[in-house]
Amino acid sequence: MSFKFNAEVRSKQGKGASRRLRHNGQIPAIVYGGSEAPVSIVLNHDELNNAQIHDSFYSDTIILVIEGKEISVKVQAMQRHPFKPKLVHIDFKRV
């Protein structure tokens, strides 16, 4: 199964901005690795939450579309809420 998600570059950083994103149904994330600089992005929570149910989400290559550019990544780390079925933050590593 292949996964493809649309992402936006984050303009505001910090705890308050991240909380506002989560409250609006989005997840802060970061893409790093390779020769390019790390990029902070925002993803739709519901799309990722539905995709992370599949085992292949953690092992297969994921395509992120950031500003019209497709980037191949894999999940490096994922933070979940302690008792709610919600994602808090995701780290992606370029492939």
UniProtKB/Swiss-Prot annotation:
GO terms for cellular component: cytosolic large ribosomal subunit. Residues 1-20 are annotated as: Disordered. It comes from the Bacteria. One of its GO terms (biological process) is translation. It holds the Pfam family Ribosomal_L25p. Keywords: Ribonucleoprotein, Ribosomal protein, RNA-binding, rRNA-binding. One of its GO terms (molecular function) is structural constituent of ribosome. The keyword Ribonucleoprotein applies. InterPro entries: Rbsml_bL25/Gln-tRNA_synth_N, Ribosomal_bL25/Gln-tRNA_synth, Ribosomal_bL25_short, Ribosomal_L25_dom, Ribosomal_uL5_bac-type. HAMAP family: Ribosomal_bL25. Part of the 50S ribosomal subunit; part of the 5S rRNA/L5/L18/L25 subcomplex. Contacts the 5S rRNA. Binds to the 5S rRNA independently of L5 and L18. Belongs to the bacterial ribosomal protein bL25 family. This is one of the proteins that binds to the 5S RNA in the ribosome where it forms part of the central protuberance. This is Large ribosomal subunit protein bL25. It comes from Histophilus somni (strain 2336).
